[in-house]
Amino acid sequence: MATWKNLDTLETFKALSEVKRVKLAEVMSGAEGAERVKKYSVPMAEGFSYNFAAKQVDDEVLNALKALAEEAELAEKFEELYNGAVINTGENRLVLHQLTRGQLGNAVEADGVDKREFYVKQQARIAEFANKVHNGEITNAAGEKFTTVVQIGIGGSDLGPRAMYLALENWAKKNNTLKMKAQFISNVDPDDAAAVLNAVDVAHALFVLVSKSGTTLETLTNESFVKEALKKAGLDASKHMIAVTSEISPLAKSDDYLAAFFMDDNIGGRFSSTSAVGGAVLSLAFGPDVFAQFLEGAAAEDKLSANKNVMENPEMLDALIGVYERNVLGYPGTAVLPYSQALSRFPAHLQQLDMESNGKSVNRFGEPVDYPTGPVIFGEPGTNGQHSFYQLLHQGTDIVPLQFVGFRNSQIGTDIEIQGSTSQQKLCANVAAQIVAFACGKSDDNRNKNFEGGRPSSIIIGDSLTPKSLGALLAHFENKIMFQGFLWNVNSFDQEGVQLGKVLAKRVLAHETDGALKVYSDLLNI
């Protein structure tokens, strides 16, 4: 079994801290920079490559990172995870989201059930249901087809599926696989549900309620909101709703739903896009075959993550460089910058995925750690971000590492040539220019116009955004975050930080408050 140790107790981490710092502006200039771009690239699945030429690493740093990976037993820990070890120690649970898209190791059983078979069965049940909806076997009370699917969930039940839907919506339109338009209700703010309900024809809408426990306050509140709207429209809510929940939740056998599809406690919400949580809405929106392609891409990237050779494992390498930046170079955050409008909500999903996983101040044994853990994650699609927060990234007092994502081709293919280049070429020109500008900077006697450079970045480059490549991209970040949690010796698979606020909110609603909580409640007229 692998040994779990704090990062700062590892001899190889101490050695890494003493390696000479790379002067990025120097090594990325001229012929040396050109050679780095060619050399520092690792193939990923589905035509992607992870290029880290503009990171503050060289062969000496990379060798130190390889040694750190070996001492931290990253490959061994991942192997234990996918073979069914209890990695989520805080909740005494397995971690099985990779098993929803493929089996990397041995059969994994929990509670007497083969979990791979369980996930495959749920995917098949969802596929059968979605096909019946699409071919008109399952309809509304008037015998008319459902045209819209609306997911009701929050956190991982919303951010991931929403980001994946938006990433593929235009691809599906282009490829004639958009079966139903999808909408999402997440916030308990009544304006969220009201706005969505005002925008859809509820008589032809199918609602997907997602709650593992069946007791999530925000989700059940929004369900009641939707049921009231259906009632006012003279519709039977039970004929317009399905549930995605656990087999032991109060929703599982309720007559309030057309069908129930199951998830389990071994998959955290933020890792659930490849489970029934994402499977139901994406299969209804695009068809089961498209969802299967998405899983195929994720499974292909998972296989690369199991490689013990760091230089052939893009997720492990990305994780190691990120920890080097956080714990040796002292950088506080990471900006995720996809140069694809289809990935407009991908940074928001990664924000939850990363910050909820590794935003921890105690290790797996409940002991305080004396080093920084998860960074602050934020981002926007390019080129919009360039006209927003890039000013701080270029000339601010903090250095923020950057993670670009770019594609050679657009999804829709509709384009126009203006001034000798297409819009897609202009988009790609901008990302290439930004990488070099951040790394190399520009000297100017006017200090206000001077760019120091030395701002590190990486880029994941692909041909185009498809279901398979989206799956690979998602798995890359999921597994990167997992490896970083291993290095920091934190439990990346629980989220106790979200619980306290929920408890206090219930006290406020029950009017069981005093002190500052009561005064704030009074100010908000609760």
Predicted regions and their residues:
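Short, solvent-exposed amphipathic alpha-helical segments in soluble enzyme
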Residues: 164-169, 198-202, 224-226, 258, ...
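Active-site phosphate/pyrophosphate-binding segments
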Residues: 229-414, 453, 500-526
